[in-house]
From Swiss-Prot:
It comes from the Eukaryota. Binds DNA as homodimer. Homodimer, also forms heterodimers with GRHL2 or GRHL3. The gene is GRHL1. One of its GO terms (cellular component) is intracellular membrane-bounded organelle. This is Grainyhead-like protein 1 homolog. Methylation at Arg-9 and Lys-116 may be involved in regulating transcriptional activation. Residues 248-474 form the Grh/CP2 DB domain.
Amino acid sequence: MTQEYDNKRPVLVLQNEALYPQRRSYTSEDEAWKSFLENPLTAATKAMMSINGDEDSAAALGLLYDYYKVPRERRSSTAKPEVEHPEPDHSKRNSIPIVTEQPLISAGENRVQVLKNVPFNIVLPHGNQLGIDKRGHLTAPDTTVTVSIATMPTHSIKTETQPHGFAVGIPPAVYHPEPTERVVVFDRNLNTDQFSSGAQAPNAQRRTPDSTFSETFKEGVQEVFFPSDLSLRMPGMNSEDYVFDSVSGNNFEYTLEASKSLRQKPGDSTMTYLNKGQFYPITLKEVSSSEGIHHPISKVRSVIMVVFAEDKSREDQLRHWKYWHSRQHTAKQRCIDIADYKESFNTISNIEEIAYNAISFTWDINDEAKVFISVNCLSTDFSSQKGVKGLPLNIQVDTYSYNNRSNKPVHRAYCQIKVFCDKGAERKIRDEERKQSKRKVSDVKVPLLPSHKRMDITVFKPFIDLDTQPVLFIPDVHFANLQRGTHVLPIASEELEGEGSVLKRGPYGTEDDFAVPPSTKLARIEEPKRVLLYVRKESEEVFDALMLKTPSLKGLMEAISDKYDVPHDKIGKIFKKCKKGILVNMDDNIVKHYSNEDTFQLQIEEAGGSYKLTLTEI
């Protein structure tokens, strides 16, 4: 028979994890209760429990004492099923095993369940509950709910409400050494505030009705929790007692030692001023709550790169990098460089110039790592238009774990920079200081940092997006020159597209994964140097441009033959007459290194079926 009633009892069960303080384990219920019987339930203990308004728990505890005084053999042999479930299909549908009631258990007014290692959430019944005939047998529940979780993620205790009752069960007649799950009985209401750590009354004390609560806690122990004791045990567990599995990637910090702008707008990233080509230190460290603890696997790999601050498509970014690269004096000019300082190389290893705008290295998170980085591009170097506002740049740091073979970094942070040339960073700071001193306090709309409080250390701002892959600029003809030392980052040929590549491979399990077999290394490809000469005949006023296909004497002869219709096989000698009047024989060395974009007057003389050519320098 079911009926509604107001007395309900919530039950809280903490999962038994090895992270919590250890207690002695018992191999069976009888061993656990054997220690209980060594400290019998005295009248004083019952009185204390009654004073605190928990007569039900006192009665249930006495019932369990009586139950476990009977030897197991007698309990197993005399146990008889006495409960019939009127809705077996419903119980089967909810995956709750049908259990039989023992005479000793059914005689009590309250039932308490011995719980094994199954982790439970906190369950708070609410709404209509099934009535329990305390003088008769238990009836099958109308609704059965089983709640379990894997971990207890936070210190604060959170309650859950369900619209229906929960399974009411009793221990099975036959003892099972490893039960898969147990069902909790509750039939009295308890204030949910008792489950919060700050709800304990000042005079409340933790009561230990038996010796089990004072012993060490160990995985596998069987414990009985009474609702009155739960509220007493929970406040005694501080937040420090909970050991969290910290998420990788939230415990790194990078700092840049450089001048910061005095005009920082609220909500904007800190602007740092750098000089082009000047090296600045970047410090990398792990910020862990457990300082002094050395990690067994402590190697990580970080990639420092210069990227565009604004959201641009991959094609736009590669176009900007290509334009910048085409305007450099040498094709080997990189966007970012790392200094060979001893202070830096004592803390990092396996340095790789994986791209023209990125450098990677390995470091130990047990120690701080310091690298010295220079940026070789201005914000205005990516456009041919004069006077336009430059593109904002970021220094971005991606850190990969050797434990994770994914191409996704465990941490990403960035710092917004503005690069000046010829000590422009210092001039910019002095200009801001002058403007700050002239401006009155009443006119200040943007908060200014006083010069005496200005810090020269910028902390990188964490980046939430870890899925977007950065664009790395790798010219095809110079990919073989990107390595430093004996290691190069293995990038599949299909990952190289056009003028650049997206970083598609993260750090790997061991350092050997970074090595490339000799057979797969790309051969060094040197771009041939081109030579351009401006030549005119003595009778002409306009010069002709001679572009040599190869910077050699043979290339010069082919260019003259094509331009002036001189048979190539009949050209005998070619001379160069310098401005000082010196006449020298032209050779490959002079053509390649000393003739590019020079102006000459060409004189062609025919003698004996061959031609003599003289290039007089103008």
